[in-house]
Design a protein with these regions (language model features):
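Active-site residues of response regulator receiver
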Residues: 10, 56
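Short, conserved "switch-loop" micro-motifs in signal-transduction and mechanochemical regulators
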Residues: 86-87, 172
């Protein structure tokens, strides 16, 4: 039986410990390390023999998506399996764009999570069926990278001037990007546009 060495990265200590305890019950899975954020996960994956990195998509600092990009870019054999509490369809496409091998939600039963790890380790792709359906229905992210940047800043309550200073754009350019994003999301204002984009995992 091949041993699968797993790294768990989640900013919630209880979640990490719970996942580790459940996975350690599997005869072929060994949790070799735990990380509290994406940066720690990247460092551990670079220094330890890790077959599968189980990464929470939303962590402070370096996100699970960014950590996945770095782990994959390092050229190691580690495969990344994204885990999230949010079934936002846009996350699925972004995860695969980052180089992830799979995507599951956190309430996946332990036996199914273990099976997902085995499949990813074997070189297969794993996707939560409900999330895959939502992703197909939602379609691709309609926002340009710059519109995403502008909406991200707007979601924190920044004015057009403040957004412009943060992104080195003129206030007029910011307003144009906001107007375009509002149109694409079918909303009435920047607050609604940011909320819709966040809900769909486009930011």
């Amino acid at each position: 039986m091949t041993e699968i060495r797993v790294l768990i990265a989640d900013d919630q200590a209880l979640v990490r410990a719970g996942l580790a305890a459940l996975l350690d019950l599997e005869p072929d899975i060994t949790v070799v390390a735990q990380a509290a954020d994406g940066a720690e996960a990247v460092a551990l994956a670079g220094n330890l023999p890790v077959d599968v990195a189980l990464l929470d998509i939303e962590m402070p600092g370096l996100t699970g998506l960014e950590a996945t990009e770095r782990i994959v870019a390092a050229g190691r054999e580690t495969r990344c399996l994204m885990v999230t509490t949010f079934d936002r369809p846009g996350y699925l496409r972004r995860a695969f764009d980052a180089g992830a091998s799979g995507f599951v939600v956190k309430d996946t039963p332990a036996a199914e999570l273990a099976e997902a790890i085995r499949k990813v380790h074997a070189g297969l792709r794993v996707v939560d069926p409900a999330l895959a359906e939502k992703s197909l229905l939602a379609g691709p992210n309609p926002l340009t990278p710059r519109e995403q940047d502008v909406l991200r800043e707007a979601s924190h309550g920044a004015s057009a001037g403040q957004i412009g200073r943060a992104l080195y754009l003129s206030a007029g350019t910011v307003r144009n990007h906001l107007s375009s994003a509002i149109g694409k999301t079918g909303t009435a204002n920047r607050t609604e546009a940011a909320a819709v984009a966040a809900r769909n995992g486009w930011l």
